[in-house]
Each structure stands twice: as structure tokens, then as C-alpha cells.
């Protein structure tokens, strides 16, 4: 959520910056609502003051033995007017809040302005794509040839966009996640967390999945009088970041760096027809997530570090990649600046996204009321939150199968994964 004071005082500037993201802010309507809010706020306060003043006179009139029926009627009339104004004010505030919750984050000034992914800017490349002297197979043919990827039974058990992994391919998939966690916890200083795969609506509102992206979630339990509805997590960013919701942490505790390996669940409502085959776009997939919670002045440096942590995974695995900075029109809803890391997939002869690393600044923190106590003045201030994939496990498996394939359909195991594979150097 954007800063309400900045929004009120810099409405034109806000509208211009949001327009670079393709979000059109109705300035006239918002201005009208703000004027109505001010009038109702003043009217409510005046009615409250009048009722309080007249209410005090009732006791004085009674003490003098006077009839207070007329005064009581006046207090009742003021009370009715006050209740009506409060209802009107609440309706205006609810509409303003709905608009505020629908607004994406303001893009950082360093984010390139552009309409879509074609205007993202490449910042670096690492590694050289391998030249093959035999026909390249894609990960589907390779995985099925190893009896390790079973799409047919996944469809029978559940439906499309799910997978059953077996044998050494399943073991390799597990090894990838374990390697990532060890790298981030041992070398990069993250604390591993085990988190719920089901989260409530307050958590999803806090990190920005609700209300805008409700259709992309798997809802398992509707809201009732007894409690909030529950949904499967689309990313571990949700439970990890919400650990500081409604909290004030000490400045000395910062930065907080957390990582988790979880299953993630997405309906992919807006991606009909895209990547319908294989592991690239699944309803259920594993991901190792990194989250950093930092002081505002540290968040841009933290974004560079977090992106570097994701890149290190690919470097250790020997997988060629490129890093791009997303333009304003391609950034995620809550992000102010995002780097996408794209891994080379030989069968597609292109780079595909394997990690997205974002600085949310105080956008999520304001929604969550996540703050820290500033040592200098002992006052609370909003935190900055960051998140990134470190990495998507399934897509990493795809990249390893395709980049490390051999002419006979076997797969060479990257050296860093061999300790997790019982010393195996290849499968198949």
C-alpha cells in the first residue's frame, strides 16, 4: 500500500509514476472522495462536540430542577445525525481503502520505463551455452526416457499441470533443493524456516496477493463467522514475510534473512495456453525462497546482495544465465524494482525465468504494519521487505536435464550435487 500522505500531497506525481506501470489512477474521482471525506470528518467532529456539550448541560439542568425532556430530544436528534454521518464516512473510507489496495507500488527511479517484457534491460550474462554434437532432447523426453517424469499418471491422479517424479530424477530434484538451502544458510547467512502451506486472508493481504490476485490462488476453506478463509501458498514469501506482521522489531535484530523450501500452488489463471507441456508452468512446484527484512536505507543494497545469492546457485551448478532489470510495465504488483534471472534452456534455444528478486520497499510493511524501533529516537518506522527465488527447483531440474544431457539420454550430475546423490556422477 502506498503512503496515504504522499498520495494526498503528490497526487499528480503518483498518477504519472503509476501510469508507467499501465495503472491509470482516476485523479478526479479520488479528489472528489477526499473532499467528501474531509467534509464528513468535519461534520462528524462538530456533531460529536455539540452532542457532548449539550449532554453535559443535562446534569446541570436537572440540578436546577428544570425539565430536561427537550434537551434529551435534542441530544437524541444529534446522535441520529452523528450515526448517519459516521455511516457515510465509513463508506467513503472503505471506497478510498479499496482504491488504495488496488494500486501497485511506485516504481523506483532506477527501473527502466517500458510497457512490457520486450523493454526489460539486460544487465549481465554468465557462462557460455554448450554446443552439442548430437540432437538435443527437451526435458520431457529426457525425463520420460529415464522413467523419472510421469505426466500420464499425474493427469490420472489429479489433472494437467502436475507431475509424478520417480527414481533418480526424484532424487535429483530433492538434491537440488537441499543444495540451495545449504548454500543460503551456510554461506549467505539466511535462517531456515519451516512454514505453513496454508495461510489466512490477512497474510495474503499483507504481501499483496489479495485482493487483486485471488483468482490465482487455490482456496481450501471459505471465510466463516468463526475465522478467515485459508488458501495454499503461491510462494513461501507469504508466510516468511508475514512473520513480522503487526510487530515492532528492534533495530539491532535487522537485517532478518529467512529462507524456506516449500511446495507452491498457483492456478495460473492468466496463462492459459502457455507452457502446457513439461515442468515450466505447473500448478504445484517446489521453490526455495529468500526473504530479507531490512532498514529503509539498506534495501537497495540488499536487493543487489539477494540477487547475487540467487545467481550464485546457478554459477555453482554451472548453468549459463542472464540477469535483466524489469521495466515498469513488467514488474510485479508490489515491487518497486525487480531483477529477473533467466537460465539457458538448450531445447528452447533461449533464456527462461528461474528467479525473480524484488525490493518491495515499505509497500508490504504498510499493509502488514511491520515496523522497527529506531534507536536514534526510539520511535517505530516502517520496515522494507525483499524477496527472491533461490531458486525455482523444478525449473532448475529442467535446466540441469537439458544442459547436462548426453547423447545416450543419460544426465551428468553437476559436481556440487554429487554429495547429495550418494556420489553418483550420472543417472541413466
UniProtKB/Swiss-Prot annotation:
Matches recorded under InterPro entries: aa-tRNA-synt_IIb, aa-tRNA-synth_II, aa-tRNA-synth_II/BPL/LPL, Ser-tRNA-ligase_type_1, Ser-tRNA-synth_1_N, SerRS_1_N_sf, SerRS_core, tRNA-bd_arm
Catalysed transformations (reactions): tRNA(Ser) + L-serine + ATP = L-seryl-tRNA(Ser) + AMP + diphosphate + H(+); tRNA(Sec) + L-serine + ATP = L-seryl-tRNA(Sec) + AMP + diphosphate + H(+)
Enzyme class of the recorded protein, top EC level: ligase
Keyword terms, alphabetized: Aminoacyl-tRNA synthetase, ATP-binding, Cytoplasm, Ligase, Nucleotide-binding, Protein biosynthesis
Residues annotated as binding L-serine: 235-237, 289, 389
Classification via Gene3D superfamilies: Bira Bifunctional Protein, Domain 2, Serine-tRNA synthetase, tRNA binding domain
Pfam families registered for this protein in UniProt: Seryl_tRNA_N, tRNA-synt_2b
Entry superkingdom: Bacteria
GO molecular function: ATP binding; serine-tRNA ligase activity
One Gene Ontology term from the biological process aspect of the record: seryl-tRNA aminoacylation
Enzyme Commission code: 6.1.1.11
Binding site for ATP: 266-268, 353-356
Family that this chain belongs to: Belongs to the class-II aminoacyl-tRNA synthetase family. Type-1 seryl-tRNA synthetase subfamily.
Domain free text: Consists of two distinct domains, a catalytic core and a N-terminal extension that is involved in tRNA binding.
Matches recorded under NCBIfam families: serS
Protein name: Serine--tRNA ligase
Organism of this sequence: Shewanella baltica (strain OS223)
